[in-house]
Amino acid sequence: MALETKPAKDPAAEDKHELDPKRKAALDTALAQVEKSFGKGSAMRLGDQPEQNVEVIPTGSLALDMALGIGGLPKGRIVEIYGPESSGKTTLALHVVANAQKKGGVAAYIDAEHALDPAYARKLGVDTDSLIVSQPDNGEQALEIADMLIRSGALDVIVIDSVAALVPKAEIEGEMGDSHVGLQARLMSQALRKMTGALAQAGTTAIFINQLREKIGVFFGNPETTTGGKALKFYASVRLDIRRIQTLKNGDEAVGNRTRVKVVKNKMAPPFKSAEFDMLYGEGISREGSVIDMAQQVGVVKKSGSWFTYEGDQLGQGREKVRQFLKDNPAITEEIENKVKAEFGLIGSADQFAEDGEAAAAAAVSEAAAADVAKDSKAAAAPAAKTTRAKAGTAKA
């Protein structure tokens, strides 16, 4: 006897069940009371609110922006960056600060480690004159200052460097050998409960830099853990694990690191994606190197042997020469970057950017030609004017 299989019902095709009129009236009354008490938009049907794209701050690495799935770090959310010592945690955070400032945003830096180097920050593009910096005495003071700045509603990004340095006041005032179990974890839990809503309302991105510790007595699984308890793991919308994987050398001299960032947690897009990019000493993240890697990956830039080509034109021989060429030609870099973003569906189509790029190039050529014509006309007019003045002088004499 053959079994009959019924076709699966499509939930989208089924009619929506109408709510009972009495229950609907009661719900509408409740929503009206909530709106009256707490303001418009405090509670609403999700369908009543138009879908909005998440605002982001670029990280400085195109590869990492693509791995995050939305083009950067989300605004109004908590982000945790953790990894071993000298892996590039602070450098990545400073690049985010610099990108926020370039868009006209305001940034703050809570330097709990008292180790911020203004000269290095300037090299990464940070406007140190407008950067708000605080070097607090203890953890409570650091988080209270951060909360007050967030609630001002004027910040775009705030960096707390680092969670491990947020020492509770009781621990500072106590003796060196005293035991203070769970003090920092409770402090973080309380602070994050207060901050989360304020961050969303103000549209401020909070970046917590964290350090790694090892659990004692772990024989199976990963013994590494982060400081500050578990609260940050729950409240963070994005968690980034950053590691050095290779030393970049120019001959025998080390010039930087090849860095891998794994998106361990992501509430905005699928997690567990990885990104690799160059981090150069004194320069930070190599934007051009990341653009080359991603453009090659999606086929916007092609490589044949050691030569790199873009739309049939040779960019150069060898990755380092191409990187320098793109650094000297930011317009081409931006054009390639936009095409890569279009391939990932983050902005308009690649064809549109190609047309825009060609139009911009044509406009640039036209402007240059017009400038040359004007220059030639001016040069030709000068001798004529000189001759006229000479004739006038002779006639006068």
UniProtKB/Swiss-Prot annotation:
Q: What is its main location?
A: cytoplasm
Q: Which UniProt keywords apply?
A: ATP-binding, Cytoplasm, DNA damage, DNA recombination, DNA repair, DNA-binding, Nucleotide-binding, SOS response
Which residue intervals make up region (Disordered)? 1-23
Report the record's Gene Ontology biological process terms.
DNA recombination; DNA repair; SOS response
Function comment: Can catalyze the hydrolysis of ATP in the presence of single-stranded DNA, the ATP-dependent uptake of single-stranded DNA by duplex DNA, and the ATP-dependent hybridization of homologous single-stranded DNAs. It interacts with LexA causing its activation and leading to its autocatalytic cleavage.
Q: Which family does it belong to?
A: Belongs to the RecA family.
List the protein's name: Protein RecA
- Species annotation: Bifidobacterium longum (strain NCC 2705)
